[in-house]
Amino acid sequence: MDFDKKKLISYIKRLNEPKILVVGDLAIDEMMYGDTERISREAPVLILQHTRTDIILGAASNAAHNVSTLNGGKVLVAGVCGDDYQTGLLTGAFDKANIDYKYLVKDNTRKTTTKTRISGSISTSITQQIVRIDRQTKEELSKETEALLIENLKKAIPEVDAVILSDYHIGTLTKKVIEKTIEIANKYKKIVVVDAQKNLETYKNITSMTPNLPDTQKSVGFFINNDVDLKKAGDKLLRDTKAKSILITCGADGMFVTEQNKKYTKIPVFNKSEVFDVTGAGDTVTAVYTLALAAGADSVYAALIGNIAASLVVKQFGCATTTISELLCAVENIL
């Protein structure tokens, strides 16, 4: 479809205005790199000579990082972490990314979610991930921790223009936390956007959600093979969630926006040839889409901006972010 380029640019320029709260499963990605030396005598495994370790914000933390890069740090996070060494890595990464974590709840019975990826390389090859180690507590929050988080939400939500619920199903977003977040946000007339992988019908009376195609199929209970199926799926999610719009991300096939009153828009993908790593691209879409909605864009223009942002971050390895200047440059090159 045709887009008004001037309108699109005006929305992008306003992405630095809204203040956002990200509620969900906060995590860090620990990226360990080494050069391959030889096969160990102890076991049939590689011996790596360690070269560096990078700490990157992941899961809901990555969504917050994407917001911070675009709006100059007008972002809060609310979630739960442990009281361990990894907690310091998480808060240190928040400090570096200019993310406010004053509403973070510490629970010494839980682990701070950390995903350690160990990668090796030799001089004649690209870096190859060898193993991933997950350190997390997947049980639901205790009643005490849940109550503390909800109290923090009561303080945080009035401060912001929009709320992102980022559910990686690691235990933070209990049924009560979800319901209270939406209830408080609706009371203060705040935008609520959901990024979840399953149980999509749990999120009712929201502004929008951004499921990918496989998660949409699981939720609606049928395979999506064409645009007719996409329309049926979008309509079902609208009914189930009572949302104002649904944005389904379709990978190489772009995006599909369903709005109330049977309004549908298909948005093509803008970058098929330079895809190096899709890790965290969904977080980028959700973050940019939410910022654009809060900046006054409708669902279609917000999705278009999110799509452009995704086309930029997939050119980079690992969880990546983009900037307003990069988005504006991309608009000139794409449209």
Region locations from a protein language model:
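Active-site metal-binding loops of divalent metal-dependent hydrolases
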Residues: L26, Y168, T284
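Conserved phosphate/ATP/ADP-binding segment of small-molecule kinases
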Residues: I170-Y264
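Conserved N-terminal subdomain of the carbohydrate kinase-like
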Residues: I20, I28-A162, T323-L335
